[in-house]
């Protein structure tokens, strides 16, 4: 792992807890959420987190959450690269994303996401690049969902849950 990985992973749980807390009872199969808010588990604004709930076969119960966090080259702000040393408020660092529904029941909310990335006093400079990064993160999560489903099919849900608890202890 790269030396910065603990920073990315250490606060990911809080990002997932935020999505759960803010969306309990409203999540549906095919939904994907995005956030970068440092108040809700984010590190700095260029580190964007994409979270996908994994439902059971009936689509009624959430079994897992899959998340990916990636550093975007630019998320807006007063300087290119979104890491100004002289910022005074978080908005000067770029577009603040907090619990945004990125994919709704399998449909990328492209126009809404572009509008978000283009918003604020200091919007993203290359929205097409941000959208490509978000698509890659959605695809990474989907691969994680597929692999989790394969593990559950092979080992059973109880065994997978038991090993996940063991890793977290």
Where are these regions (language model features)?
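Residues on a specific face of well-ordered alpha-helices
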Residues: 14-17, 52, 64, 95, ...
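Short, Lys/Arg- and Gly-enriched loop/turn segments at beta-strand edges
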Residues: 41-47, 75-76
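Gly/Pro-rich active-site capping loops and adjacent beta-alpha segments
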Residues: 61-120
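Short alpha-helix boundary/capping segments
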Residues: 4-7, 11, 46, 82-89, ...
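Glycine-rich, charged/polar anion/phosphate-binding loops
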Residues: 36-37, 50, 82-84
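A short, hydrophobic, proline-anchored segment that marks a local hinge/packing element in signaling
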Residues: 49-57, 67
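Gly/Pro-rich turn-and-neighbor structural signature
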Residues: 1-41, 152-169
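N-terminal leader/propeptide and maturation segments of large enzyme subunits in energy/redox metabolism
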Residues: 96-169
